[in-house]
Amino acid sequence: GADGALLFEEDVLCRIFGAYSRFETLKGIALVSRAGYGSTSMDYAFFDNRDYTSFKSLTLRASAMDSIYTRIRDILIQGLLEDGGSILPTQAYVQVVLYINGEYWGVYNLREKVNKYFLAQRYGLADPEKIDILVGNGVSLTAEDGAGNSDSGYLDYKALVEYAGSHDLSDASNYAYVCSLMDVENFAEYCAMEIYVGNTDTGNIKFWRSEQLDNKWRWIPYDFDWAFNREDGSTSITYTTGYRRDFFTKYLHPDGHGASKGFSTVLVRALLQNSSFRALFLEKCALMLQIFDTDTMIARIDELSANIKEEMAYDTAKWGVIRFVTWETRVEGLRESAKNAPEYFLYYAQQYFGLSDAEMTEIFGRRSSLTGVS
């Protein structure tokens, strides 16, 4: 606790967690309860905003690719989504300082781990084993349970995409069939969110379904370490101009999305041919402007960065990957995004959908103050 008192103690399995972040200096660590270690769950109220206090697994994340930039990018976005009333299932977090065998290891975020147990808790599902999860690693899509592309969930999802791509979804019956297989409100909100935050790692995805609910596919907000100002496929970071990019065209590109455009956009583009879904999607875009309101976002950036500012001085001194002043500059880059992203989002929304000024006012309350972007 704050006074140094021990709050929780348990023997758990610890293992390196993540994909490309395994190559970072500060690696993610998964904490997993195992009966062989004494307990099948970690029973403690780790997160103030969760009404459940039993966890099969947790993660300690140093923000992966954001570990040398701000250390708060992912928790910033997920926290604002949750507080803003998003229907997307976000991961709870607590900012912590990690010691390993008594050695100072630096600033981490304790997080819920996105898996079948996480979903069972969030949605009140009795049997975690009756949950299908599909995952993307930035390159390909597969089933999380190890069954790979022979998994029934993978095959069913592939069939859904093929149907959407080969049928006119402006037709009410065709659209209704697709709606019977996926939660279109969840999907519309997920896509609008990815575009607003300018995520350049959109291929790192997780989505799921369960017969215990309605067996519809739903998407999970996951891994925003490359959001806001990150340039895909490049080691260079533009901290004051990254928000200027047209993420509507990027995310909805016919060739695909993700760092290598390896993920199909057939489903979302087919759905956008339906006027009802198009209206829903634009409604969700308007919601993102509310959730990521400039003042709200800057206040949260200030809060999260202040929480770790003192520790980041020690952290940067220990690892030497970046200087403390560089961290401060990069946090300021997030503030710049908060100030400028709304206008560019509005501008590109109007350009992509060909909306009139009157339609912009009806949907968003206003049009962008920008008159042109070069």
Predicted features and spans:
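Generic low-polarity alpha-helical segments
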Residues: L31, L81, A341, V373-S374
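Conserved ATP-binding subdomain of kinase catalytic cores across diverse folds
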Residues: G1-A147
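Middle-to-C-terminal accessory/interaction subdomains
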Residues: A5-T25, D66-S67, V96-Y99, Y104-Y108, ...
